[in-house]
Amino acid sequence: MPNTHDFGPLVHISAEAVGNPGQRRFRLRALNSASESAILWLEKEQLSALGEAIESVLSAEEYVHQPLTADDTEPEPVFPLRPTVEIQLVQLSMGVNSESRRIVLIAADGPQGEDETHGVTMEFDYRNGFELRSQISRVVAAGRPPCPLCTAPMDPAGHVCVKKNGHQPH
């Protein structure tokens, strides 16, 4: 990727949804020590898959979460009004540096090798990974509940369940 911004180690990474259930957009917000920020827009399924991948890494690395004491709690980060980088994700890769106990994310807004593709690389420690995984779970679960029969999201205005009515739309 010729247009890649390396954020290095992050001081903060979080996941959030913007909008009402059924109309939500999902994003990761990242901030490094130089106050550079990134917003990575992604699909709900991508966010959920990232959370599962982080959970797998933490399990494989045998990470044991130690909650912060009240004295160690970090203040809420202040993000710049305009992010340094803002992209709609097309590709998201994750790696692990076991020596430094960091998770590495590589994100791009287009296919690898394209001249116009923009991307970011960033890394965060296992503690931030644990907290991000917990946050992703809450964000994803806060949407429309799945239908118990077909697992499609249930719309508050009504839900047509293909398993209940016996046919799928054409």
Regions found by a protein language model. Name each.
Residues 24-30, 50, 54, 103-107, ...:
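Short, structured motif recognition centered on aromatic/hydrophobic residues
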Residues 1-26, 68-123:
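Intrinsic, low-complexity N-terminal interaction/targeting segments
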